[in-house]
Amino acid sequence: MSATKNPVLITGGAGFIGSNLADRLASDGHDVLIFDALRRPGVERNLRWLQARHPSRISAVTADLRDEQALADAAKDAKAVFHLAAQVAVTTSMVDPIDDFEVNIRGTLSLLEAVRRHGQRQGRRTPVIFASTNKVYGDLADVPLELVDDAYAPVDPAIRAHGVSEARPLDFHTPYGCSKGAADQYVLDYARSFDLPTAVLRMSCIYGPRQMGTEDQGWVAHFLIRALNGEPITIYGDGRQVRDVLFAADTVQAYVSAWERIEQVKGRAFNLGGGAANAISLRQLIAHIEYLMGRKVEVSYGDWRAGDQRYYVSDTRAARHALGLAEPTDWKRGVALLAEWLRAEKSGRPEAAPTVEAA
């Protein structure tokens, strides 16, 4: 447990986004308490990296979201909470929906209650910023699409120009979509019902350094790592599905801005991604990887996954305005930077990896 009186608590803080956020906050002079079960590949390495960079700023608790007492103890003195820990794989939720429920819904509710009760006793209102997902909008099957340059694109010119906005009705698909969607709504309702300063960021596809490349940790890094290792890539679907991608440093800036502006944005949900300018198909990403590597990549195709969207691009206008966000990193530059970082990690020279600030 942290010896610091009022740390920033990051659940899932040893993960990809969490470790980038922890690094930024510690660099800004905040003490950070990481709450993480350390079950996913690579997270122990992220934690060691953080503790080596910030030995006096980073402390950690190894525990599961389902451990209510450990969660309550971690939240007790926090001056802010970034809730990133979750069961994140649609495929895993299909195999064990109850485990998915316990982690994503019960764990989130336990955290909210711990923050609320400690706040009542101590006479303070602790901000909670929650990492949600674009999956809360369902499979978007009602959005007419057409093929444009070997990628799906909406027929509706407004959606094509800007993406999917927060006005889109929620439509939970798969156990994962249901659990994250319910957690999303609980976080928002605690602002309405209990005046807890909360905000929700519904993330699209995030990529960047400290992403370890398993499929559920992000397909951009997964594709890059397999390509760098000379291994084949499997695409589920036809590869024409489109997502907007956002670089890690830009994502971290959005979380920090949400905390800094929490009184202005409390009770609101924002779509967070690279937006229409950074919308790419899986095939387009592979073509760019081949360009960066100077050789072809072996690709095979599997069946579509349950609930997979043919098209999802975030309309980021609300987030950019409310959070004061700059234009994000161009995806081609970001993918090249991630490839450089992965090469440095693979060579055992992490100090050679690039350090990138938000665009």
Language-model segments: what does each one mean?
Residues 44-47, 184, 221, 283, ...:
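Short, surface-exposed alpha-helical segments at coil->helix boundaries
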Residues 140-162, 175, 185-259, 277, ...:
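NAD(P)-dependent short-chain dehydrogenase/reductase
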Residues 46, 89, 216-219, 223, ...:
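Activation loop
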Residues 39, 66, 89, 100, ...:
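Glycine-/small-residue-rich active-site loops that bind phosphorylated ligands and cofactors
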Residues 21, 27, 59, 63, ...:
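C-terminal substrate-binding subdomain of Rossmann-fold SDR/epimerase-dehydratase oxidoreductases
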Residues 11, 102-105, 176-177, 213, ...:
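Short, solvent-exposed loop/helix junctions and linker helices
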Residues 1-204:
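N-terminal Rossmann-like NAD(P)+-binding domain of SDR-like oxidoreductases, especially those catalyzing
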Residues 70, 80, 99, 106, ...:
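Residue-level recognition of oxygen-bearing side chains
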